Amino acid sequence: MTHLVLDQALLSSLNDKVVVITGGATGIGRSAVTLFHQNGAKVVFGDIADEPAQEVLSSLGQERIHFVPSDTTSYASQLNLFRTAHSLYGRIDIVAAVAGVANPKSIFDPEADINEEPSMLEINVNTIGSLYTARIAMHYLRQNKDGGDIVLMSSIIGFKETQDLVPYTTSKHGVVGIMRGLHLQAHKEGIRVNVVCPWVTRTRMIVGMQKGWIENGFPVNESEDVARQIVICATANRGANGATHTGAKLPFSGKMIYVSGGEGYEIEDEHKALEPQWLGEENSRVLARGQEFMARPEFSWDPDRSS
């Protein structure tokens, strides 16, 4: 685990950068929109919530900020968001997939009607929506000489079990899977992919449990704290002469950032380093050989081709 501390000097690297953010009207997304905009970025954000989005526009003024009504579960809607940003500015440099939902009602409740199909909104928004965002982001970032950055939004539930929230847990594990599945390919194309995993954050999601949580003295993030980690991910590779944020190891890609009590910690590198302990040394050694085999240029999953 490595503590990450923002280097304010790197914020200047955001000046004139074009940033696309999903779920930018409220909560963490709104804080991310604000932080990027305050540091000179041109921000195009999407959301289904029109009224809060208009409030964001009013608070930040009319320059370098645009809202595009967008439903993350719709591929066509996300395409429109990105196409609008590219049409406005001619490029896209940074993408933050922040849109997310949570349903506190358990689909495994013994009192639930088994004949009623359960809602999969969390899967559709959090996982499939993030896949859509990442896919379209790759298309546009490939057009840049220096690639770009994709920042995904998971949760502590993306790597830690929590009772009752099964679809939400599944969806956020899926977002971590997007990072792990994409970052190696993206790195070859100069594109960095990272994922932020906050613990309890003061947003609409925790209204029902906030009082008891705080009374017990448990840590709470503010949405601005999580937005700061998004910005760290988006700027860690943009410093001159190898300069980066305190604790960041370059190249900063394929990282998982745990956010607790307002502070960010990179945990993916340590997870990988400890693999021989939790998987077993021999298993880890054989797995590494298999991964090397699958990384060969001639390797293919296509059943009609031979690797």
State where each predicted segment sits.
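Active-site helix of classical SDR
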Residues: 134, 171
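Canonical Rossmann dinucleotide-binding motif of NAD(H)/NADP(H)-dependent dehydrogenases/reductases
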Residues: 6-44
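Conserved glycine-rich Rossmann-like NAD(P)H-binding loop of the short-chain dehydrogenase/reductase
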Residues: 39-55
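Active-site-adjacent segment of SDR/Rossmann-fold oxidoreductases
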Residues: 39, 160, 181-191, 200, ...
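C-terminal helical subdomain
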Residues: 195, 215-306
